[in-house]
Amino acid sequence: MKAYIAGKVEVGQDPPILVLNTGDNFYYCGIQNTSDPQISEDYTALFSGMGMPWYNSLGNHDYGFSPEAQLTLNLTIPGWIMDARYYHRRVSISSSIVANIIVLDTNPCVSDYRTDDRRRWDPCGTQYPDCSPIAEPCRFHENIISQDCDAQLEWAKGVLASIPNDHSEWVFVVGHHKAEEIDSADFQTEFLDDPRVHLYLNGHTHNLEHYSVNGQAKYMTTGAGGMVLMGVGADSVERFRPDHHGNHTKRTHAVRSIWSRVVTGFTSHTFMNNGKMVRTEFWDAKKNDSVYSFDVHI
């Protein structure tokens, strides 16, 4: 579920300079506090030796116990970055290349998660219906409804407005869910459709996929770090959002799967042509080989 910037991780060419993590950091219900043993088992024992910054996002499985605990892991884990539930970092890749990393918390923006129907949002599934075999009862729903998705959208629009509009800087947006699933506020029309957003990376679906929304092929699923499952694309998706008067308005976004592969793997993103192009490659981790790529120009 990790996306790597600038280089191949396993191949040994051009080692990466940073990692973008699309969420679900600690299965099944997240961590209880900063002393939770899962931190060592699922992260530090596996990745702490990589020696590069990790820009982390929250997934739905991080919402069961304490999402806030992950915001302070930087105090004990070198390289762990999660400034807030959603945040922006401006990163100098080189003297001439700047990348704006906008990390969203898409979880409170999925309308199914805000309902009272537990079957739509239980992060532990049928095996652990309330997470009690692991630790304590799941607090997923109360954690979700405590967040304001509309406020996050206004924040994201403000961040984008602060970035130069001359395409001199790259903008990478990271979220846990596929673009069409972020439906309790209109992130698609009001934010992601903006041409200043060059790439959107998500996890959640446990596969690799390149897809387009509203004709823009700048979207990818890089959720194949583990528990690989079958994923599907869609030709169109209709989303309904209640307005402030309780009425529902219909939004239709054309979603098309361009390429997908059900395989354990990751993506790499390499700056080329003097920083004017980024090549995204999808990697089969078992074969240690690139299986698909596409280019985006600034």
Regions found by a protein language model. Name each.
Residues 1-35:
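N-terminal active-site segment of His-dependent metallophosphoesterases
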Residues 17-19, 169-171, 198:
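Conserved acidic residues
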Residues 27-165, 187-199, 205-270:
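Extended active-site neighborhood of metal-dependent phosphoesterases/phosphodiesterases
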Residues 160-181:
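Short acidic, glycine-rich surface-loop motifs adjacent to enzyme active sites
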